From Swiss-Prot:
It is a peripheral membrane protein. Part of the ABC transporter complex FbpABC involved in Fe(3+) ions import. Responsible for energy coupling to the transport system. Belongs to the ABC transporter superfamily. Fe(3+) ion importer (TC 3.A.1.10) family. This is Fe(3+) ions import ATP-binding protein FbpC 2. SUPFAM superfamilies: MOP-like, P-loop containing nucleoside triphosphate hydrolases. It comes from Pectobacterium atrosepticum (strain SCRI 1043 / ATCC BAA-672). Its EC number is 7.2.2.7. GO terms for molecular function: ABC-type ferric iron transporter activity; ATP binding; ATP hydrolysis activity. The complex is composed of two ATP-binding proteins (FbpC), two transmembrane proteins (FbpB) and a solute-binding protein (FbpA). ATP binds at residues 34-41.
Amino acid sequence: MLELHRVSKSFNGRTVLSDIHLTLENSRRTAIVGPSGSGKTTLLRLIAGFETPDTGVITLNGQTLCDNGFSVPAHQRRIGYVPQDGALFPHLCIADNIAFGLKGSKAEKQKRVDELMALVSLPTHLQKHSPHEISGGQQQRVALARALAQRPALMLLDEPFSALDTGLRAATRKAVMDVLQQANVASILVTHDQGEALSFADRVVVMREGQLSQSGSPWALYHQPNSEDIATFLGETLILNAQIDGGKADCLLGRIAVDRPTANGRVRIMLRPEQITIQDTEITSTAHMRATIRNVEFSGFVSTLTLRIHNAEADVIELKTVSHAAFIVGQQVSLSVNGAAHVFSQ
């Protein structure tokens, strides 16, 4: 269990982290997500022992790592660290990179290297290759194997997939998840990629301006964010004014269900694009609302539609939808809402 209590950090008089409270107990994979400058990498460096907090206490499995000026050195914390670029030693071969820091006889080290190469699914013939002779995805697997060599209690991943192209990023992320699960090592991933955080973790922590804004399961954060800022940060969204009465909300899209039917009065509600079905009016005659397409931005799998809602004065909305039909400007469409809209707390 990792615990942070009242942790703060400043650099040159500028506060980077402020009064951080965080407990990671049951979660095996945690993602800390936030925009650039939110303090997430600094938080990771404090946990790793590369920096010392100005105030606060950090403990791991009951051991105090830092408190009131006292700090356990990074190499004694049993914490693995994989940086963004892998940081492999260019003058060492793959096997020597993985074995770096291992104690024991040459045979014992080689046995451990063989085990780790198999664990991260790297062929044995790469052991004598130099880092520049293998792909970016393979380099990240070597960095992970090197971090696992010391049998850490916790693995820290500092945006390790950001330098990879899209297809390789997803494949490498899945491979890393599988390896960490097989090794039974808890992990914390720092990323600015919302989709990466939601798909990697079973607990997500959102950071904004040096503070923790919200934490919970990926599903809860995506569907029930605490604020409009978090809602828009975590994915495409449609936020509307609404009036709740009788357990339902009257809004631009008609009368729809909400996740807080006990709320009353004027509120702000949120829908995700996948909750809204868009169909040609010739296909269906039943819908909450009708609209005219004003603009279409096609980008392959997804199209962004600008819609003018009928019976509403100058109300125009933008929606992303799967490009299952060839939408055209001027087309009349019907809109229907699936599931409940999320009601923001006032």
